[in-house]
């Protein structure tokens, strides 16, 4: 259920790309839609062999990837911010998912070149990613919590009502001490036999010999 709602919100979110101040000719290549998210492409010259590529959102570093060559056969790649990335011979792609309106900002690809010397820092591209949500999604985000709360309230009220009706239909048999009617103990009405240890002899007058 939660995943369905998440995909629905991702479907509602629309992304508009506006060209930045740098590399206007490559404005359409920096942002690419990818599996409900955005792929941000940062290109660098083919001659660069060791470098650090940073993806900045405004002044904040979102992704930081460093490629160094320890020897002829070993290449070390460090991804400090644990961003999903894809590295090629002349570009680094970073992937952002679960976007909302808070992600709207300028995104900057910042390249620090270690090899070939000299060391230098370049801003490769800077573009604005404008994310806005449709009116339907805004209304849905407002009414969905209210609807869920109302649904829970109705369910609780229904359960209480069902319990009350069931208790009223099948009352318990517990004796009420304040009741007008009292339970009476069973009384044995059978006659007890006469005592056999007492015997009286009655003699009629004139019957003696």
Swiss-Prot record:
- What's the protein's topology in the membrane? Single-pass type I membrane protein
Localisation per UniProt entry: Cell membrane
Which is a Pfam family this sequence falls into? V-set_2
Q: Which residues cross the membrane?
A: 142-162
Q: Which GO terms describe its cellular component?
A: plasma membrane
Keyword set includes Signal: yes
Q: List GO molecular-function terms, semicolon-separated.
A: signaling receptor activity
Cell membrane among the record's keywords? Answer: yes
Provide one Gene Ontology biological process annotation.
Answer: T follicular helper cell differentiation
Recount the PTM note: N-glycosylated.
Residue span(s) of domain Ig-like V-type: 30-133
Where does the signal sequence lie? 1-19
InterPro entries given in the database record: ICOS, Ig-like_fold, Ig_V-set
- Disulfide pairings: 42-109, 63-83
Q: Which UniProt keywords apply?
A: Cell membrane, Disulfide bond, Glycoprotein, Immunoglobulin domain, Membrane, Signal, Transmembrane, Transmembrane helix
Q: Which Gene3D superfamilies match?
A: Immunoglobulins
Q: Which residues are glycosylated?
A: 23, 89
- The protein's role, per its UniProt record: Stimulatory receptor expressed in activated or antigen-experienced T-cells that plays an important role in the immune response. Upon binding to its ligand ICOSL expressed on antigen presenting cells (APCs), delivers costimulatory signals that enhances all basic T-cell responses to a foreign antigen, namely proliferation, secretion of lymphokines including IL10, up-regulation of molecules that mediate cell-cell interaction, and effective help for antibody secretion by B-cells.
Its quaternary organisation is: Homodimer; disulfide-linked. Interacts with ICOSLG. Interacts with PIK3R1. Interacts with TBK1; this interaction is critical for the maturation of T follicular regulatory cells.
Query: What is the protein's name according to its record?
Result: Inducible T-cell costimulator
The organism named in the record is Bos taurus (Bovine)
User: Which lineage ranks, top first, belong to the organism behind this chain?
Assistant: Eukaryota, Metazoa, Chordata, Craniata, Vertebrata
Gene it is expressed from: ICOS
């Amino acid at each position: 259920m939660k995943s369905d709602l998440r995909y629905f919100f991702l479907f509602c979110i629309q992304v508009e790309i506006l060209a930045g101040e740098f590399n206007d000719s490559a404005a359409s290549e920096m942002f690419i839609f990818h599996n409900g998210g955005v792929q941000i492409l940062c290109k660098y010259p083919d001659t660069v062999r060791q470098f650090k590529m940073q993806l900045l959102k405004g002044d904040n570093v979102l992704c930081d990837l460093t490629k160094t060559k320890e020897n002829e056969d070993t290449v070390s790649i460090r991804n400090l911010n644990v961003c999903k990335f894809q590295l090629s011979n002349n570009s680094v792609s970073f992937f952002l998912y679960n976007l909302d309106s808070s992600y709207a900002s300028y995104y900057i690809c910042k390249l620090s070149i270690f090899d070939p010397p000299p060391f230098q820092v370049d801003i490769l591209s800077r573009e604005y990613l404008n994310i806005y949500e449709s009116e339907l999604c805004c209304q849905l985000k407002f009414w969905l919590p209210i609807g869920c709360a109302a649904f829970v309230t109705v369910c609780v009220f229904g359960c209480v009502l069902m319990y009350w009706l069931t208790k009223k239909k099948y009352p318990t048999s517990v004796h009420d001490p304040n009741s007008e009617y009292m339970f009476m103990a069973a009384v044995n009405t059978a006659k007890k036999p006469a005592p056999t240890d007492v015997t009286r002899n009655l003699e009629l007058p004139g019957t003696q010999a």
